[in-house]
Design a protein with these regions (language model features):
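ABC-family P-loop ATPase nucleotide-binding domain
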Residues: 1-26, 237-249
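ABC family nucleotide-binding domain
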Residues: 16-230
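H-loop (His-switch) and adjacent beta-strand-loop-beta switch element
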Residues: 227-240
Length: 249
């Protein structure tokens, strides 16, 4: 049975950026299997900011992996930016992801031997997007967007965790993706840096980006307009928690 989905019709009738349809994901464990996602369905439309919450080990990060194509469902469909992600070959999947999805990881995953500037240029190089000279200019612009232009030539290990996370967000924006997916983006940050990251996410959504975020921080999650709560591999709650808390954040 398809779960209640308050955003199925989208903002102003917009088409979904993300469609998750009856998705099941099981992993083999010895001679048996463990089912982590149990028939999940929901849509996300252009310009939405959605927080995915729930206890550890209940399928939140697995769901993000389905949406980004890092992993594939055992059953069901995952359609993102019009592509049936679960059906793409690895080569086509990598090309699609490089163009359409920006991923912000919990532990930054910046290449330690490259400067912040080089790390942000790398997705453009891999996707062969933008002219070589424009890539550098764009990377500097993105570093300026996250307040790190003066740190451009430093290695990741020379800046703070909060600065690395902001650089990781800039890297996720390198190819101007329609969708940004963030897995515990504030999990290793103090409250001030967490607030800065959320403020940046809010500005990106205001500019028309679509953002999906997994978080354990209940207070920050409440500031996001829509919450999807996953418990035991199923959607237990999918609701809008109000523009009043989000407005002016």
């Amino acid at each position: 049975m398809k779960q209640n989905n308050p955003a199925a019709t989208g903002k102003n009738g917009a088409s979904p950026v993300v469609q998750v349809i009856e998705v099941v994901k099981s992993f083999p464990v010895g001679d048996s299997k463990v089912t982590v996602l149990k028939g999940i369905s929901f849509d996300v439309t252009v310009g939405e900011f959605v927080s995915i919450v729930g206890p550890s080990g209940n399928g939140k990060s697995t769901l993000l992996n389905m949406i980004t194509g890092i992993d594939r469902p055992t059953a069901g469909q995952v359609i993102v930016t019009g592509q049936e992600v679960h059906k793409l070959s690895e080569n086509r999947l990598a090309a699609w992801r490089g163009q359409h999805v920006g991923i912000v990881f919990q532990f930054f995953q910046m290449l330690p031997a490259l400067s912040l500037l080089q790390n942000i240029m790398l997705p453009m190089d891999l996707a062969n997007k933008y002219a070589p000279r424009e890539r550098r200019e764009r990377a500097m612009h993105l570093l300026g967007l996250v307040g790190l232009q003066d740190q451009a030539h430093k290695l990741p290990g020379m800046v703070s965790g909060g600065q690395q996370q902001r650089a990781a967000i800039a890297r996720a924006l390198a190819n101007d993706p329609q969708l940004i997916v963030a897995d515990e983006p504030t999990g290793n940050l103090d409250s001030r840096n967490s607030a800065d990251v959320f403020d940046l996410f809010g500005r990106l959504v205001d500019q028309g980006k679509t953002l999906l975020m997994v978080t354990h921080d209940k207070e920050l999650a409440r500031r996001v307009p829509r919450i999807v709560e996953i418990i035991d591999g199923r959607i237990a709650r999918d609701e809008f928690v109000g523009g009043a808390q989000w407005a002016g954040y």
